[in-house]
Amino acid sequence: MASTPPTAARRSVAGYASPLAQPTPYTPPAPVAPSPAESLPALPVPTRKGRTISLWLFGVLGFLLIALVGYFVWALGSFASVVGLVLALIPLTIVFLGVRLIDRWEPEPKRLVAFAIAWGAVAAVGLTLLVDTALTLLLGIRSEEFGAVVQAPVVEELWKGLGVFLIFLLARRAFDGPVDGIVYGALVGAGFAFTENIQYFGVSLIEGGGEQLTVTFVVRGLLSPFAHAMFTAITGFAIGMVARRHGSARAAAGAGALGLVGAILLHALWNGSATFADFFGLYFTLQVPLFIGFILGIVALRREEARLTRARLEDYAAAGWFTPQEVTMLATPGGRKVGLAWASQLRGDRRPLMRAFIKDATELASVRQRAITGRDPMAVNDERALLIRTRATRAALLAY
């Protein structure tokens, strides 16, 4: 790494605010890397403020969980509830692993992942049950067709979407763009489907025994495990588009409302295909193409996310923090594989260090993007800590 910044480092990088900022129109480049001869400072832990969910919210969800467990035991009995629970874990695992693939480039904080699943599985389901019961008692709505095609899409997507919006409000520094929105939305939807499947599987076992349970499990657990995840991911995508630009709560609410309309319509279309038409016919002509389109959209967004990571790391390379070769290694899937393979051949197998280097560099790129868009006043602190961490990790990787 050069001891003095290259010429490119002296040039302005538009739109970036840092501790070195001066009155406009001057806008400074990324902080210039110090000389490698300087001693490395102690490795700090990046600040977590604004990146997680308060513990009291988990306490509320825990209370609701106890109430929900009591409801299932009362309505289905212990045996049917346990059978439904075990079977419902299978599609939940399928969806969770799929979401992890989407989220592999820049993984979301574990506590937010847990909150998203818990909100869908506990809060959204509980609130949906309350609204459904109230509508039945107050308005006398008992039509299965109306419930499936109108009531369920509106009520369920509203409460699921609220969970995604809460994550944006309470941890917006971990909500960087549409991919994050899709991840959080899909996790909320997966949690909701998990609890809903417990009920469906339990009722099928009680009413039709093993034969009906098998049919229900195949249809809900194997043929369409991603349905709820896709619906709520639309809401998350809309909120994420706003999060990438400026992060205004009002703008996110407006975009979330538009995404919610899309989620409701897709949910209604999905339920309608099962209620009014030949399920298997429409499954292959409608639902499978929708799922394929969803996957292609995610692939395109992932590529855009990687391109943005590379662009931001190139800003730091221009200031001397990374070499061009390191940027290629850190900001491309192939480069990461090569880097991990190289680290495995070093003394003591240093793949954990390489993973930490990749993780911190990716987070650094996200921090810079938030700073450029002016939506994170804490970006300077995170940037400073992450730059120190990446230097220290590189030094550990190259140490003999």
Summary of predicted features, one role per range:
Residues 1-400:
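Hydrophobic alpha-helical segments at protein termini of multi-pass membrane proteins
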